[in-house]
Amino acid sequence: MSETLATDATAPAEKKDFIRQIVREDLASGKHTVIRTRFPPEPNGYLHIGHAKAICLDFGLAAEFGGLCNLRLDDTNPAKEDPEFVVAIQDDVRWLGYDWAQLRHASDYFQVYYLAAQKLIRDGHAFVCDLSAEQVRQYRGTLTEPGRNSPFRERSVEENLDLFARMRAGEFPDGARTLRAKIDMASGNINLRDPALYRIKHVEHQNTGNAWPIYPMYDFAHSLGDAVEGITHSLCTLEFEDHRPLYDWCVDKVDLVGHPELLQPLLDKGLPREAAKPRQIEFSRLNINYTVMSKRKLTALVEEQLVDGWDDPRMYTLQGLRRRGYTPAAMRLFVDRVGISKQNSLIDFSVLEGCLREDLDAAAPRRMAVIDPLKLVLTNLPEGHTETLQFSNHPKDDSFGTREVPFARELWIEREDFAEVPPKGWKRLVPGGEIRLRGAGIARVDEVIKNADGEIVELRGWLDPESRPGMEGANRKVKGTIHWVSAAHAVEAEIRLYDRLFSVEKPDDESEGKTYRDYLNPESKRNVRGYVEPSAAMAAPEQAFQFERTGYFVADRRDHSEATPVFNRSVTLRDTWAK
């Protein structure tokens, strides 16, 4: 992909968070002339809603200040990575409305990392250690006790270079040796107690095959990857704040800017020389109630078949939210509403749902659909009577135009819109009572037909011929208006009624001896057969609608077709979880 300046027409003119203030100051002082950011996910799973905040910040910041944002796949742990995730990550970023200046992989820089590690050894800043993982833990110390130096810490430069070369050659088994930074085993920051920089893993890599039996650790690869790409502002969540001293140590001790020879492998590949010193800045991660976002727990939900896959519309993956009917505009609005700060907080799920309602209220055309059908026969219309009515596609926006809706003697209405014995304040159909049929006139129920079990199976009634749209009688006041579809023309559809996956605000809370599995909401998915007007059935996958009086729905991106329509409820018209 060519390197072009990021643009984002949807970005607000001015945002005031502390990160943008830093960027403004850096540009004003001349410290930087072009802002460079990156989004660096590991391709070991599907992105979730928490990643949306990072994507919108990394790409949005670059766009806002006319800069560049790379997508870098942090593929340094090949045992857990898969090309399926690589494709999904790119799909998610584009879906949110962003594009990258360059698509890079940490594996593009493996030779640079190796040369950098050799430099650290020559400079006396790294050593090969033979301690096992368990021994390293024992030597590390605790938060209140300093660690102890490895017995291998004082190996000579020559011995370390030889051992590291033999690690590279594949001579040793997994776990036999590591390359460790030589920093300070008494540091109050445990991340600085001689952390590992390289480990031995004889695992085939999706990009480099079996070329490398050693792989760099995250902190080493991440910091140098930023430096290689000339990233000016490396944005990450607060849990990496304690890692920043190690990040800076790696950048400063390797000093790619002062040692351009380390970059020669990139130049040999035709990649540009862009090295610069990056600055890491931390912000609060996105935490939302009624969700879990641990990759381990999301994986368990899928593998234990507690959900229907990574793109199950109840999942908080971006693929799941997209299939549920969440829109890129709603996701970006949500990130804006949440804001950027250094204070961790728990965001109410209703904020996310509210952003979707706000977007779809403006963007979704209206249609009629009946989810729990009950037949209403208008007996004063002749057998076989049909006509075509004109309906607005959006009551607030004439640019959406109009559509034709068939109307007939026999209709489907919602079962819940009729009450044989109405509760107090009831404003819908009752025996002998009148109701306005949306866009068609005023109807009355004269007869209730039941089956042998006493269940209502049909209503028979009358349509006031003087109350048709445009007639004087249409102005007559009645208590309520209901929607309908023509029984002769409506298309049967599968309608999936989705709700929150968990029934409690904090499903991660295990204080009562329960786990998130115990808090799964049994009402989070209900499949029903309903009827939709013909123009809804003809919709393309991912087309969103407001089904009038019912909620916002989307044509399923996987299963929907004109012949077999499938609609997912994205969100109810109102917050049904409000306390």
Curated annotation (Swiss-Prot):
Gene Ontology cellular component annotations, sorted alphabetically: cytosol
Enzyme class: ligase
Residue positions of motif 'KMSKS' region: 292-296
Molecular-function GO term, any one: glutamine-tRNA ligase activity
EC number, UniProt record: 6.1.1.18
Keywords assigned by UniProt, alphabetized: Aminoacyl-tRNA synthetase, ATP-binding, Cytoplasm, Ligase, Nucleotide-binding, Protein biosynthesis
PROSITE patterns found in the cross-reference section: AA_TRNA_LIGASE_I
Cellular localisation: Cytoplasm
Gene3D superfamilies: Glutamyl-trna Synthetase, Domain 2, Glutamyl-tRNA Synthetase, Domain 3, HUPs, Ribosomal Protein L25, Chain P
Domain of life: Bacteria
Residues the entry annotates as binding L-glutamine: 74, 218
Biological process terms in GO annotation: glutaminyl-tRNA aminoacylation; glutamyl-tRNA aminoacylation
Principal location: cytoplasm
InterPro entries in the cross-refs: aa-tRNA-synth_I_CS, Gln-tRNA-synth, Gln/Glu-tRNA_Ligase, Gln_tRNA_ligase_bac, Glu/Gln-tRNA-synth, Glu/Gln-tRNA-synth_Ib_cat-dom, Glu/Gln-tRNA-synth_Ib_codon-bd, Glu_tRNA_lig_a-bdl
Covalent S-S links between cysteines: none
Homology family: Belongs to the class-I aminoacyl-tRNA synthetase family.
Subunit structure as annotated in this protein's UniProt entry: Monomer.
Name of the protein in its database record: Glutamine--tRNA ligase
Upper lineage: Bacteria, Pseudomonadati, Pseudomonadota, Gammaproteobacteria, Lysobacterales
